[in-house]
Amino acid sequence: MHLYKPACADIPSPKLGLPKSSESALKCRRHLAVTKPPPQAACWPARPSGAAERKFLEKFLRVHGISLQETTRAETGMAYRNLGKSGLRVSCLGLGTWVTFGGQISDEVAERLMTIAYESGVNLFDTAEVYAAGKAEVILGSIIKKKGWRRSSLVITTKLYWGGKAETERGLSRKHIIEGLKGSLQRLQLEYVDVVFANRPDSNTPMEEIVRAMTHVINQGMAMYWGTSRWSAMEIMEAYSVARQFNMIPPVCEQAEYHLFQREKVEVQLPELYHKIGVGAMTWSPLACGIISGKYGNGVPESSRASLKCYQWLKERIVSEEGRKQQNKLKDLSPIAERLGCTLPQLAVAWCLRNEGVSSVLLGSSTPEQLIENLGAIQVLPKMTSHVVNEIDNILRNKPYSKKDYRS
């Protein structure tokens, strides 16, 4: 049965019922003039203005010993966004642990980096079971425990696929998802992670098994959400369809590479998935493994990542013809950075953030100075006007277009 609740506009004004005779009407008007207006409680109250709503909220919180001025957002200037269409709020800049934790940097430097990030408002810390063969998770968990940060103030994410040498210790089988996540939690010294990612697609495992296993670990309290990494739009859509068909939990986010020279997936494919099924984007490598940092403008320095034996592929990319073209484009972008009063890395990170479809950009830093510089991109973001973005596009000449753009 439909119950009708009248709105304020539906309640007739008392003046509409005045008697027709002038003498009686005059008496009624005199009576109404001294009578208090009807209480508004019977009506749906009008939504208060932003200032009034904030004032009421401040008064309410003050009673409970909480202040709006003492929030992390207000104290640090960090911006927060929803992870896809989920309710999880993540800092728009996160700290990744690939290459650095357990490898390129010492445990002391790792602690310093996490402290700087946390005190700057970063709440998102990303790792994976494969990073430094699990050591990155150990270091991350040890620092969290040592610092005594509230678990509820953190968003910890990890990724599963490569867990060990045995055939059953890799992939996305139900066995490895459950056992792999248990192993990650032990190394992290945590009861749960906020998001567990499938680190790549697994053609050897049926999609239904993957989705069922992810749903299971969430229902068991081992994770809050699950997402994908390096998956195609078609694979993500298949996972969503399977989840809906069998009343299971779909992914909320895709981790994708995104920077000035890698744009199509994040700017064309993922926005369509976001609008259709609510999958957001968490991006990594905003400086293209250091290529955009400017350090490779005159070759490969000895202390750089590209000089390491295991990163010969990066060195080859830098010295290739395409790599030289990219360095020339970066030189053309430098005047824009100077005009905005920022460094080239800050411009590159702010350029990623200007895409509102990106929930968070993962930073990878090997020194405190690098991290502080990259976090400064937050101050550059308001300067990323449409004019500045068009200037950058004119230099890069790689803006992707979707089929919708061609039809319009």
From Swiss-Prot:
- Might you name a Gene Ontology BP term for this protein? regulation of delayed rectifier potassium channel activity
Keyword Transport among record annotations: yes
* Predominant location category: cytoplasm
The UniProt entry's GO CC annotations, sorted and at most eight, read: cytoplasmic side of plasma membrane; cytosol; juxtaparanode region of axon; potassium channel complex; voltage-gated potassium channel complex
Q: What InterPro entries does the entry give?
A: K_chnl_volt-dep_bsu_KCNAB (IPR005983), K_chnl_volt-dep_bsu_KCNAB-rel (IPR005399), K_chnl_volt-dep_bsu_KCNAB1 (IPR005400), NADP_OxRdtase_dom (IPR023210), NADP_OxRdtase_dom_sf (IPR036812)
- EC class, as a word, reads oxidoreductase
Q: State the active site.
A: 131 (proton donor/acceptor)
Where does the chain bind NADP(+)?
97-98, 104, 126, 199, 229-230, 255, 284-289, 295, 305, 364, 366, 370, 373-374
Function summary:
Regulatory subunit of the voltage-gated potassium (Kv) Shaker channels composed of pore-forming and potassium-conducting alpha subunits and of regulatory beta subunits. The beta-1/KCNAB1 cytoplasmic subunit mediates closure of delayed rectifier potassium channels by physically obstructing the pore via its N-terminal domain and increases the speed of channel closure for other family members. Promotes the inactivation of Kv1.1/KCNA1, Kv1.2/KCNA2, Kv1.4/KCNA4, Kv1.5/KCNA5 and Kv1.6/KCNA6 alpha subunit-containing channels.
Q: Which family does it belong to?
A: Belongs to the shaker potassium channel beta subunit family.
Q: Can you say what this protein is called?
A: Voltage-gated potassium channel subunit beta-1
Q: Which gene carries the instructions for this protein?
A: KCNAB1
